[in-house]
């Protein structure tokens, strides 16, 4: 007699129940995509489901192993990881992520990475978890040698790179370093010089005291992001030599000794945030070739004397700092081809600044007379006299302005009428451009 299953009061035969296994009927590519989002140890367990699933896990292109728990599972973790890598049958291993703690020794990690290289891994992510009391996992040059398929390398947290000789990652295109320590300045150099195809570099540092001079010399580099949050206690600094660099993002430099951009003639776009109190820097001076520029801390870095931003068409200035408008004036005077001006306000603007007067440029800047077409002000503080002065000046002098947009923060009902009056005053300003469309809205 055929065994019966009872579901919701209905009799259903095992044969019919098996037919309801619709997931096994999905295309293999879709199944592999689904399995790629599941921890690899769980993926391996699917091999017992049916004959079709027996070998399917071996084709999964993205593998993630997490050893951040009890060290007593070390042996099982190692066996599963090694089994997965040696049994992998896809032509290319798209990605391998290893999350580990101090319970994993460097020899095992080296063996796993070497096996991944044999499987032509394209993306490798190494994450070491711990706290300030833990000894960092030490990686040496041999771990990153003789690979010609790796495209992306990401190294995170409690890892020390001790690289006495150059690495050899010929095809590496993107490198991400998050709170990684280096043994010395030579280790930084030996990592970067061993990546001749590197185009994208992200460096995140916090409370790092590993190297004083972080030198970035990469001829092929096109995009660079540096986050450094050594607030008030930073020593040393950065030297950047990247002749092919097109995009630069610097965040959090405060109290460093220097930041020198020695060679970056191809820069197109730059974003500078929270940069202040650097004894020796040439940041703005090195950005005169950019077409798009965002500045968050305008008054705390040197303005280049006699320099002209003659390629700049887009400028974004944050209005939170004291007398931010002084830098705005200088940027308008130095950017003859500027087409789009954006001012961004924050709720953390310093109190007690109202009543200070803005001194506009002595002569109307060339960009206002001949090029500026769009003016955006996000977080416009309608109650502040200095901001009204700046807005009025732009409207009265930008002859080709097509659209001016002012976004104000939401306010209490009791202040709605006062805000309406202030915005109506701004709307009544005699605009230099007859075709300028004025827009107000809340954010």
Curated annotation (Swiss-Prot):
Coiled-coil features, chain-numbered ranges: none
The LRR repeats lie at 74-100, 152-179, 180-205, 218-252, 272-297, 320-345
| Keywords recorded for this protein, A-Z | Leucine-rich repeat, Repeat
User: Is Repeat included in the keywords of this UniProt record?
Assistant: yes
Q: Reply yes or no: does the keyword ATP-binding apply.
A: no
Question: What are the F-box domain coordinates in residue numbering?
Answer: 20-68
Q: Which InterPro entries match?
A: F-box-like_dom_sf, F-box_AtFBL13-like, F-box_dom, FBD, FBL13/AtMIF1-like, LRR_dom_sf, LRR_FXL15/At3g58940/PEG3-like
Q: Where's the FBD domain?
A: 357-408
PANTHER family in the cross-refs? EMB|CAB62440.1-RELATED (PTHR31900:SF34), F-BOX/RNI SUPERFAMILY PROTEIN-RELATED (PTHR31900)
What is the recorded name of this protein?
A: Putative F-box/FBD/LRR-repeat protein At3g49030
Q: Which organism is it from?
A: Arabidopsis thaliana (Mouse-ear cress)
